[in-house]
């Protein structure tokens, strides 16, 4: 007899209704709820899955390299990075007519292709790759690594090679290895690659395995390192006239602190980047030897945390209990990891355009826009996930005795103050920002645009001036040539930095005005409201005045019946659900702002943003509507063009998004009645009633239907905005 799905839960497998399938899918990854799951087995399964995850990532990157080498135009692109469009892969589609084949045949090849907007060409070029053979070698290497990781994942599930629970909870050893190995040694290896391969390649010197050991990356070799004369490595850097990829204007320095950008590529100096990674390596390798393991020397994490008790008693027991709490809670660990990675991903989005590290990418506007949008959306998902697992921690793992009067307990005790302050900030930001926008709309609508309320963002301008931007005339710190900050760094990195920050050729500290001030506060509203919902969801996850026993109902529950009718929508899951909508809206405001600002800056018409961004109709008309032209006209009665695929995606993105509302607005009873009516009709329809099913059809629960609605809303949201960003930018600058 075949075992019914799901195998991990006998109770669900024996459920006679279709909820068996839906609850099975819903709890497939809730490993700790599975039958017979022990703590040790849980850790082992998660550990093994990490290898599978890494294998998938490396297989995917191997596929990128392979398809570009096979179907792309990397070697042609290398010869002219500013003019040749980089190809991701070829397209074969039976729907393509002659006009489509013609429209999608570009990039100097004779077959239809997709253009790459991920920046991989710029990355591979910058790190020293030049030929398709290089790409094939990379693809093969990653394929081998992927296979090795898959084997390692399988191996660590075998009884002999399963680590024990003590190994997983050995925090100091894990921290040492991750700091030294993961961050330190990998940074050292990367700086080594830059020094030995990428920097010589940028100077026209081809280094591969055949001459790797016989070619010195610096004329003095290791002598300056062993004699302590490290400054030699910074002498004779590339000149401002250096032609990237050639020896013309090239220097010999390998570790510099020039600041600013390479004039031709508009990317950071490779020698600065190598220096950065070497410094990171030293710091992290040192940090990875600080924690106590085998020899009883170094820091004990528990001792450090237990000692963190402020003397005046304002934080009670301080960090006591946190070591045990974090060690024993995977949800707490995951929450902290997701929050850290979320912040890092958002920072990547900000830095990739402001301080581009890849040659010529600053001039590939479509790639710049795609990468910014991509990283900000991912950051949003990671941050919401962090709070979701924080809430699950409070429901499942939080022990009041272990955490008695420590910072966690005091967060729970002060939750009313925390939540009400966040609420006040959100209300203040919302009413004032919207009030200003609407006032300005009224003024423009009634023919008195000069009466708009326009605030100059003086504090932000002051910060820009402190970093060296001279335009505002503040004459402070780095924008003052006589300040201590300027004098201290004037001989090192400051000349390059000052040239960059005051140049109109990059996105470093863009000039800001009233439109930026308003949208900044609109984004602040979104961030604070999302945070309010998530923080409230986590802090109220164990219980509230309305429902003190909430933790007994678990992370997600629809309602606690008619007896306590006010208990709908108050589970921690509901907070996550609501926060997702706010997160998506906030990230869209962030990306709208970034994209519109850059479209006008790149087009040499910054005034268009400055004039139209101070009122809401300006955003709707001059950003969204005006830039949707390539999407609306990708295909029409007269034919199609290369934007047709984005136009089509823009359309079906809207449709998926709209489908979400069907599940979000109609609730369970409607679906149950509909299903029962359909079953009645099916059973009375000749021929159709020959088909029977074992499970009794039952509508999705409220929580599940909301998840289906949210999934459609989210996927549709992204499939609408992604093609908008790519097609509208391509339409202007391709």
Curated annotation (Swiss-Prot):
Cofactor note: P700 is a chlorophyll a/chlorophyll a' dimer, A0 is one or more chlorophyll a, A1 is one or both phylloquinones and FX is a shared 4Fe-4S iron-sulfur center.
Alphabetically ordered keywords of this record: 4Fe-4S, Chlorophyll, Chloroplast, Chromophore, Electron transport, Iron, Iron-sulfur, Magnesium, Membrane, Metal-binding, Oxidoreductase, Photosynthesis, Photosystem I, Plastid, Thylakoid, Transmembrane, Transmembrane helix, Transport
Membrane-spanning residues: 46-69, 135-158, 175-199, 273-291, 330-353, 369-395, 417-439, 517-535, 575-596, 643-665, 707-727
Catalytic activity: reduced [plastocyanin] + hnu + oxidized [2Fe-2S]-[ferredoxin] = oxidized [plastocyanin] + reduced [2Fe-2S]-[ferredoxin]
GO biological process assignments: photosynthesis
Gene Ontology molecular function terms on file: 4 iron, 4 sulfur cluster binding; chlorophyll binding; electron transfer activity; magnesium ion binding; oxidoreductase activity
Source species, domain of life: Eukaryota
HAMAP family assigned: PSI_PsaB
Subunit structure: The PsaA/B heterodimer binds the P700 chlorophyll special pair and subsequent electron acceptors. PSI consists of a core antenna complex that captures photons, and an electron transfer chain that converts photonic excitation into a charge separation. The eukaryotic PSI reaction center is composed of at least 11 subunits.
Function: PsaA and PsaB bind P700, the primary electron donor of photosystem I (PSI), as well as the electron acceptors A0, A1 and FX. PSI is a plastocyanin/cytochrome c6-ferredoxin oxidoreductase, converting photonic excitation into a charge separation, which transfers an electron from the donor P700 chlorophyll pair to the spectroscopically characterized acceptors A0, A1, FX, FA and FB in turn. Oxidized P700 is reduced on the lumenal side of the thylakoid membrane by plastocyanin or cytochrome c6.
Family: Belongs to the PsaA/PsaB family.
Name of this chain's protein: Photosystem I P700 chlorophyll a apoprotein A2
